[in-house]
């Protein structure tokens, strides 16, 4: 809100035929003359009131919602933790069965050495974790 709007909304009291300034004893028959008087003589007081109103009506910033942290270790990482450097049988979502030693793993992939894929011998195979349906350790 600016000062002109504040002066327009200001309630000016009428005493008989005259209007009275709310800040001093100045009286006049014309409302516009009273508003000009208020703007010229009492500008500092009105400026402070408008500033206080603007501070009170200022919208408060809402705190940001905390985003839930994604867990880096999901269930498959937990399974692979115990299967590292062990012989395992891995069932994939396309129906393939991979049997071999789980050696290297990162966030998205695992590497199986000396693998047997559908009765074929393969030296190494890299599998995406998203395609793993089941992982069964063959040795304790």
From Swiss-Prot:
SMART domains: ZnF_C2H2 (SM00355). Gene3D superfamilies: 2.30.30.100. Keywords: Metal-binding, Plasmid, Zinc, Zinc-finger. GO terms for molecular function: zinc ion binding. It comes from Methanocaldococcus jannaschii (strain ATCC 43067 / DSM 2661 / JAL-1 / JCM 10045 / NBRC 100440). This is Uncharacterized protein MJECS06. A zinc finger (C2H2-type) spans 21-42. The keyword Zinc applies. To M.jannaschii MJECL27. InterPro entries: Znf_C2H2_type. The keyword Zinc applies.
């Amino acid at each position: 809100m600016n000062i002109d709007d504040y002066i327009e909304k200001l309630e000016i009291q009428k005493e008989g035929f005259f209007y009275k300034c709310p800040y001093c004893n100045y009286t006049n028959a014309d409302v516009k003359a009273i508003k000009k008087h208020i703007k010229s003589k009492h500008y500092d007081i009105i400026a402070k009131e408008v500033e206080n109103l603007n501070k009170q009506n200022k919208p408060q910033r809402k705190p940001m919602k905390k985003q839930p942290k994604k867990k880096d270790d999901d269930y498959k990482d937990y399974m692979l933790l115990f299967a590292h450097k062990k012989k395992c049988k891995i069932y994939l979502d396309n129906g393939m069965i991979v049997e071999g030693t789980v050696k290297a793993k990162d966030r998205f992939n695992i590497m199986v050495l000396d693998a047997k894929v559908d009765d074929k011998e393969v030296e190494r195979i890299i599998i995406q974790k998203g395609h793993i349906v089941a992982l069964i350790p063959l040795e304790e």
